């Protein structure tokens, strides 16, 4: 296999689209001939302090380029973060303050180096060239596109026809992202499929500014733990890189068997041919251990697996439950009793009494390994006795009545 073929095989693994494939091959040939690494960028707006597994689809593709000897640029969009990416939005996003954006950005460098080699990664902030830009410069930049062109975007087009407001500054977002490619002289830009319009804007602006246009590579969007929506903090379906090992393992074990295969494909280099014949539970545990090990170390991955097997697979009550609670007479009714609904609610492991009631009715409560399905039932508490509660599939509590 030639070096060109080897590089293409790794670069194209898991991608959705390359614009244009011939240009990518041409750039790689020139790179090999001149011994000049390609400049490959991917941008991330620090709208929240946590990076999650959804972000790592792009970061791992950056890693592929890095392994091939190219210069990867992790661009922190501290300037674009203050605009707010309108992609997929049905209304204008609330702009973040500069202080909040910078606060979030501080955690990004620490997190990305769980994957990328810090010695071979260029970290940039787009405020470096955007903040000094004058009003004249912004006018010049905005002259490179038109309102008609912006309305070709699906989200803008939909909002316009639904007579929902579109703020002028939102039109600036694709232009600023595109100008990032000009400022960095990027050869390749990576992004999710939902970023295609913005990525193509980079190609257009590079042409306008006399540069060779970048190749655009789009990557699939990773579904969150619900298996439906794109992984995001706002959707509550994300797995953060800085989740604890046990929390990360538990979230990964909660995904569907079908989504498990998707995670194997997008988040690992494992051969799917070897995964599909395996028992789903075993394959899922292997996936969870693999991902936990990547971000917390091999030992943490194995410990999380053992803890999960003890807590869920073997149905043993864990040595360290989620909550340990001591009730007093003031917490009980007359006769030293308490309703199951109140008992579950007092653990704090459900958000409300109504949720506790729903959980009990659906058979999601066990007291001392006995399933409870009557939401009107009461429990007689014996002073000094410790009651073991399993609440839902993954939460455990120890409750003791002090007797006073």
Q: Which residues fall in each region the model found?
A:
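Positively charged, low-complexity intrinsically disordered leader regions
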Residues: 1-41
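Divalent-metal (Mg2+/Mn2+/Ca2+)-assisted nucleotide/phosphate chemistry catalytic cores
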Residues: 15, 95-218, 227
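Conserved nucleotide- and phosphate/pyrophosphate-binding catalytic cores
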Residues: 205-404
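Well-ordered mid-protein domain cores that form the structural environment of catalytic cofactors
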Residues: 63-110, 115-116
């Amino acid at each position: 296999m030639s070096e060109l073929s080897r590089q293409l095989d790794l670069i194209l693994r898991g991608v959705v689209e390359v614009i244009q494939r011939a240009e990518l091959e041409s750039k790689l040939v020139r790179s090999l001939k001149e011994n000049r690494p390609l400049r490959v960028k991917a941008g991330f707006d620090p709208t929240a302090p946590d990076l999650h597994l959804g972000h790592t689809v792009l970061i791992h593709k950056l890693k592929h380029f890095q392994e091939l000897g190219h210069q990867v640029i992790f661009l922190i969009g501290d300037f674009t973060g203050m605009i707010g990416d309108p992609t997929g939005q049905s209304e204008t996003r609330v702009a973040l303050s500069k202080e909040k954006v910078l606060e979030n950005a501080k955690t990004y460098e620490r997190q990305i180096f769980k994957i990328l080699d810090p010695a071979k990664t260029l970290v940039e902030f787009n405020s470096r060239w955007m903040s000094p830009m004058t009003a004249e410069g912004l006018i010049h930049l905005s002259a490179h596109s038109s309102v008609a062109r912006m309305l070709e975007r699906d989200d803008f087009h939909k909002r316009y026809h639904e007579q929902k407001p579109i703020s002028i500054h939102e039109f600036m977002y694709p232009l600023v992202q595109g100008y990032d490619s000009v400022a960095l002289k990027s050869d390749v830009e990576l992004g999710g499929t939902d970023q295609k319009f913005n990525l193509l804007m980079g190609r257009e602006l590079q042409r306008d500014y006399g540069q060779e246009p970048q190749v655009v590579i789009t990557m699939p969007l990773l579904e969150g733990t619900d298996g439906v929506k794109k992984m995001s903090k706002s959707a509550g379906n994300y797995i953060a890189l800085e989740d604890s090992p046990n929390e990360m393992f538990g979230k990964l074990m909660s995904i569907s068997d079908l989504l498990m295969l998707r995670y194997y494909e997008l988040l690992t280099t494992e051969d799917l041919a070897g995964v599909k014949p395996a028992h789903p539970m075993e394959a899922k545990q292997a996936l969870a251990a693999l991902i936990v090990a990547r971000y917390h170390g091999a030992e943490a991955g194995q410990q999380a697996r053992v803890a999960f097997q003890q807590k869920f697979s073997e149905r043993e009550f864990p040595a360290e439950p989620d909550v340990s609670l001591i009730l007093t007479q003031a917490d009980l009714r007359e006769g030293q009793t308490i309703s199951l609904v109140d008992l579950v609610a007092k653990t704090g492991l459900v958000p409300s009494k109504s949720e506790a009631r729903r959980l009990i009715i659906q058979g999601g409560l066990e007291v001392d390994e006995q399933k409870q399905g009557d939401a009107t039932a009461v429990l007689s508490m014996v002073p000094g006795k410790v009651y073991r509660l399993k609440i839902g599939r993954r939460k455990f509590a120890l409750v003791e009545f002090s007797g006073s």
